[in-house]
């Protein structure tokens, strides 16, 4: 995500300045729509990373709380592979659903940009 702002064509910023648009308007109408896919990708990466991390969650829950990934590992250790596979499959489906929602949102931004380009 660090390199994306450097990839945005400087002529967009110059055009905004020549049209006397303020900094806030330039950010909200030019930069943020272009950065939206990168921001959503970073959110997806962070979400997947957070879901799969057990150690950080240990500090946030009580001893009675069951974390899905820890529960799956306990089922494997106890030899209950069927239960572990079922819970793992559910976890994968939930994560994929959230990723597809983010992908759909990114697709919407691509579609709206191409529509705007065709109208111009």
UniProtKB/Swiss-Prot annotation:
Coiled coil: none annotated. The chain crosses the membrane at residues 39-59, 82-102. Residues 60-81 are periplasmic. InterPro entries: MetI-like (IPR000515), MetI-like_sf (IPR035906). GO terms for cellular component: plasma membrane. Keywords: Cell inner membrane, Cell membrane, Membrane, Transmembrane, Transmembrane helix. Gene3D superfamilies: MetI-like. It is found in: Cell inner membrane. Belongs to the binding-protein-dependent transport system permease family. FbpB subfamily. PANTHER family: POLYGALACTURONAN_RHAMNOGALACTURONAN TRANSPORT SYSTEM PERMEASE PROTEIN YTEP, PROTEIN LPLB. This is Putative ferric transport system permease-like protein AfuB. It comes from Escherichia coli (strain K12). The lineage of its organism: Bacteria, Pseudomonadati, Pseudomonadota, Gammaproteobacteria, Enterobacterales.
């Amino acid at each position: 995500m660090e390199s994306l702002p450097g990839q945005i064509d400087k002529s967009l910023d110059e055009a905004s300045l020549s049209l006397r648009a303020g900094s806030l308007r330039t950010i909200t109408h030019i930069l943020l729509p272009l950065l939206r896919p990168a921001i959503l990708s970073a959110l997806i990466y962070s979400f997947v990373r957070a879901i799969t991390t057990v150690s950080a969650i240990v500090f946030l829950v009580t001893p009675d709380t069951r974390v899905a990934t820890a529960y799956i590992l306990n089922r494997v250790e106890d030899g209950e592979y069927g239960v572990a596979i079922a819970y793992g499959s559910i976890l994968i489906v939930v994560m994929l659903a959230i990723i597809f929602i983010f992908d759909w949102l990114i697709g919407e931004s691509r579609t709206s940009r191409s529509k705007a380009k065709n109208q111009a």
